[in-house]
């Protein structure tokens, strides 16, 4: 099917339309709920895992039969770091496939008008061209450390495409870059680089440490997008995009790990020294998504990295430190 873009596919003018946000308690889902409420949507359906286990097909069927949402945003997923992916591969591929298959099929069967499936930049090959275009999908081998999760997410994209091709159903997919913001994971053992840096600098500041040492040289380039920008992009795509191909969602702005660390250090107010352990690995030299397709649709990010870090640190102080 041909792609359709622009105002002619604008579909979310009814602010009372019922919208099911799957995974509303996570980093992504909670931001999407905030954005929808901010834009005046009043009929959001939100279910905790205890209320609705998305891996149970019969329960998901029953939910859609009773609630009959008009739109679905699928932000629910089993996520984790390298250690978790290596230790529980069956969980990462199995649980995510179950969630996706159950929600996508039930949404179609029960007349959902449109579904947005959210994936991850890890769907792309380990040695993808930089910046990574949507067309890089399935062109080479994945990063082995998270291939179980990545394969499940690729299957989600392909499931949406299959329902569009066979049934003409409006299911679309968005692939976010590295995200950060309120409700991020700040756990010392399994958080990603940005929240990990924020926690380390904060604890060093509180404890009066003289130095924070970061792994590597600080030279790798990374891209970060504030989760509120992602949420804005999701609502934009749900409203304005209808196409077979998935859409990259990124900031388009690169920063070295060294620059990021300096910025986090400044935002947190740590006045000690920043050191680098160059005996430790740097990881991939560059990872940037090509988000020109999304830009051509008329969407651009609004939150600068500095402002986003300040907002995230404020949230961290109020919600993590005070627990």
From Swiss-Prot:
Residues reported to bind substrate: 200, 215, 222, 282
Key word Isomerase present: yes
CDD domains xrefs: GDP_FS_SDR_e
InterPro entries from the UniProt entry: Epimerase_deHydtase, GDP_fucose/colitose_synth, NAD(P)-bd_dom_sf
Important for catalytic activity, annotated site positions: 120, 122
UniProt site positions, description: Lowers pKa of active site Tyr: 153
Superkingdom, natural source: Eukaryota
Record-listed E.C. numbers: 1.1.1.271
UniProt pathway: Nucleotide-sugar biosynthesis; GDP-L-fucose biosynthesis via de novo pathway; GDP-L-fucose from GDP-alpha-D-mannose: step 2/2
Active-site positions on this chain: 149
GO molecular function: GDP-L-fucose synthase activity; isomerase activity
Modified residues (N-acetylalanine): 2
Keyword set, alphabetical order: Acetylation, Isomerase, Multifunctional enzyme, NADP, Oxidoreductase
GO BP of this protein: 'de novo' GDP-L-fucose biosynthetic process; L-fucose biosynthetic process
Catalysed transformations (reactions): GDP-beta-L-fucose + NADP(+) = GDP-4-dehydro-alpha-D-rhamnose + NADPH + H(+)
Binding of NADP(+), residues: 23-29, 153, 176-179, 192
Distribution of this protein across tissues and organs: Highly expressed in roots and flowers, less abundant in leaves, stems and siliques.
SUPFAM superfamilies: NAD(P)-binding Rossmann-fold domains (SSF51735)
Class of the enzyme per the UniProt entry, highest EC level: oxidoreductase
Subunit details: Binds and stabilizes MUR1. Homodimer.
Job of this protein: Catalyzes the two-step NADP-dependent conversion of GDP-4-dehydro-6-deoxy-D-mannose to GDP-fucose, involving an epimerase and a reductase reaction. Not involved in the synthesis of GDP-L-galactose from GDP-D-mannose.
HAMAP family, sorted: GDP_fucose_synth
Protein name in the entry: GDP-L-fucose synthase 1
Taxonomic placement: Eukaryota, Viridiplantae, Streptophyta, Embryophyta, Tracheophyta
